[in-house]
Every structure is written in C-alpha cells, then in structure tokens.
C-alpha cells in the first residue's frame, strides 16, 4: 500500500474493535463512492448510514478528503495484491496472462470506477494528484517482475517501457463498449499484452 500522504488522517485503529469500526467506515465509504460519486459523498451522511456519530467517523478520518484518500489507497493496494497473488499461477506465461485477465475484470467493475474517479479528481487537486502518481509508481514496480519473466533478455529501460505499454492496454480495455463476447475480448487483451511483453 502506498505510504499515507495525508496528515489529516486520524489515529487509526489500535484495537480489534477500532480496526473493525475503521474497516466498516472504509467499506461503506467505498460503496457510497461507487454508487454516488465524489459529489454525493459526505462524512455526515456516511456516519448516519452506519449509525455512528460524525465525531466517531472523524476520529479515524478527520476530513472527507482523508477518507477518500484512504479508500483509493486501499483499492490500489488490492490491485498490487492481485499481481503478487497471481505470480504463482503456473508458468511465467500462465501467471502473466492470469494477472492481465484479473486486472481487466477488476477494472471493468467497482475498482475501475474508483480509479477513474481518482484520475478525474487528480486533475484538479494536488494531494490527489500525488496519490495518483504514487499508486501508478507502485503498480508499475509490481508489474516489472511478471513482464521480465516473459522475456529475461530485456534491459531495465525496456522492461519499464513495456510495463507502461501493458498498463495502457489493460487500463484502457475496461473503458471499451460493445466488445462482443467478453471471454473472446479478454482472451484478445491477454494475447496483445503477452505480445507486448514477450516480443
């Protein structure tokens, strides 16, 4: 997970009960952000929906922005965890294809909504821009080993370039509409990503 960038984060949970409350807040915030977008997101309404006082939410996240940053950080950490988990999925080729497939599936759902939201916010808010960049930096770093595994003759600069090309393909594919049979589409995305990494 990227390092916390926001000094307004409250004292995060130090007890099992505190951890549970913090997790409930983050899960509910994620759901509301996916359903209503950032304009419809408020700490007060979130607290009410959880049957908590606003001050209870603010104990963990002093501001709306602090909570949003945490939701985005956690979502990005889950993407990196997918890469790490899938690296043991058979051969280097099978693992790489599994990573690409799983990321495209995730990004066609709620995860894609959240990361698109972060991308939009980052255009206008410096703190979110910093988080957006650090998320992609961590993502690129996690993807380097699977790309290198596809062609171990590549130098570091070429690996970094191919990581970005694979990311561009995987990042953009969930935004496409009318893709026809989803399984065929996913297979083709995997084929193209493999070609980028291997050739």
Question: What is each stretch, according to the model?
Answer:
Residues 108-130:
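Amphipathic alpha-helical segments used for helix-helix packing
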Residues 73-79:
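Short, basic, alpha-helical segments at the C-terminal edge of helix-turn-helix-like DNA-binding modules
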Residues 70, 81-112, 162-166:
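Hydrophobic alpha-helical connector segments
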Residues 131-142:
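Short, solvent-exposed amphipathic helices
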Residues 1-20:
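N-terminal intrinsically disordered/low-complexity leader segments
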Residues 21-24, 28-66, 70:
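Helix-turn-helix
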Residues 24, 28-36, 82, 114, ...:
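Solvent-exposed, amphipathic alpha-helical segments
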Residues 129-133, 150-199:
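Hydrophobic/aromatic-rich alpha-helical bundle segments in the mid-to-C-terminal region
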